[in-house]
Amino acid sequence: KNGYTVDIYDKEDRLGGAIYTGIPEYRMSKIFLDKVFASMKEDKNITFHFNTKIDCERFEGLRKNYDKVLVATGAQIENTYGFEPGNGLYAGLTLLYDLNIRGNHEYYKKYKKAMVWGGGNVAMDCARSLVRIIDDVSVVYRRSEEEITANKSEIRDARNENVKFNFLCNVKRVLRDESGAVTGAQLIRQELGEPDSSGRRSPQSVPGSEFNIDADIIVMAIGQKVDLSELAEDLKITENYRTTLENVF
């Protein structure tokens, strides 16, 4: 609209980013998204480069070849708090990608009892996706329902779909059998103290309140963070969406 010609680089084979890979079909139709993105492809001022992962070398080339570079990669690094995914332990976005893009719904039917750890919209997407495959799904969240960050409508819909909630609990240990397969989690009850930087009351573990729950699949949906080091070691965010590199936004 401002007269620029634009090149878009994406590591996936399609447009949409997290809208396409992370939002389940029951929330947003892929047919609708395909129609929206098809109209973008018709714009002669936009060129798309799919299946293209940008590393430091390619990023330096982009800086040399373009007047402006806009980085819109999102928060792709999933928090795991030291727990190693595998054998029934999954990261939230990885699960959603597996279901939404690869369509591996049949694979997850082998599980009987699911636990989703987290209280944001990604956690709700994971729980509501799994309850369509697995009958027994519960959410574990360290604060109360009052502090939960997921949309209230998502919580209501999850409950209507028989997702159970365990508030004021946090994961202390992931339990596994001799083969390494997930068998459940050791939780510890929480109590709320003074508000933290987010304005929500800070959870504190209650000593001696540990208890175990059974689960053969656990999904960690406990936040993501931005990592720009793959593009440039000195790339940092400053004020007004600018960065420490000239003409990079």
List each model region and its residues.
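Rossmann-like dinucleotide/flavin-binding elements
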Residues: 1-9, 49-60, 77-79, 94-152, ...
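Rossmann-like dinucleotide-binding cores of NAD(P)H-dependent redox enzymes
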Residues: 8, 12-42, 127-173
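Short acidic, glycine/proline-rich loop/turn micro-motifs
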Residues: 18-22, 83-84, 198, 231
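Feature captures the FAD/FMN-dependent oxidoreductase FAD-binding
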Residues: 34-84, 173-186, 191-194, 217-219, ...
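Short, conserved active-site loop motifs that form the nucleotide-linked donor/cofactor pocket
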Residues: 45-47, 163-164, 248
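Flexible, membrane-facing loop/turn or short amphipathic-helix motifs
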Residues: 193-204
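A short N-terminal beta-strand-loop micro-motif at the entrance of redox/enzyme domains
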Residues: 202-212
